[in-house]
Design a protein with these regions (language model features):
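Short, low-complexity disordered leader/linker segments with a strong preference
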Residues: 1-34
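Short, glycine-/small- and polar/acidic-enriched structural segments
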Residues: 29-174
Length: 177
């Protein structure tokens, strides 16, 4: 009698388990047009590359395509032209968008808070920001790097006019140095 009861209970549990597992579903396949998001070479945006590598969008049924840009400015120009749906960029660059660009609609998703990792790279003769006076400084103009340079110069009583600015995309700065 107990043997038949154990077989019945085991069979019933197996049936319940099978029914439970059959109702689990994998995420739905992404539907509709994809959302295309741009990103470029900055550590705060590398989680996008990890998400792509680990197929996180597909696993969660989200139809997202990430577009890599070699240059930060190129990514902003592409977004401003409406050729991608969103872009990873600094808040001050987002704020500076003209109202007519990209239909005038901007949504900000904060995915990183910088704690001051930006710095000026210089040779050993430059001991302080004040030593940059009269020197050539390479910076990507009109973006956050330029803004931070101006702040650093202002902190020591200098302006952009006190240095010789050489416009250079950020991704080329280390090579040029």
């Amino acid at each position: 009698m107990f043997k038949k009861l154990r077989v019945f209970v085991a069979s019933l549990l197996a049936l319940i388990l099978a029914i439970s597992l059959s109702t689990l579903s994998s995420p739905a396949a992404p539907k509709g047009d994809p959302i295309t998001l741009g990103y470029s070479n900055w550590a705060g945006w590398w989680p996008w590359a990890i998400a792509v590598d680990q197929k996180m969008f597909e696993k969660n049924g989200v139809n997202v395509q990430m577009k890599w840009f070699d240059g930060y400015v190129q990514s902003m120009e592409t977004f401003a032209a409406g050729k991608i749906d969103g872009n990873s960029q600094t808040l001050n660059d987002t704020i500076s968008f003209l109202p007519g660009e990209n239909g005038g609609e901007v949504v900000v998703l904060v995915n990183d808070n910088s704690a001051g990792n930006d710095q000026i790279i210089a040779d050993k003769s430059i001991k302080s920001v004040a030593d940059l006076k009269g020197k050539t400084v390479a910076v990507e103009e009109g973006v956050v790097d330029d803004f931070l340079l101006v702040l650093a110069l202002n902190d020591v009583g200098l302006t952009r006019d006190d240095v010789i600015i050489k416009g250079l995309p950020t991704d080329q700065a280390a090579t040029a140095f």
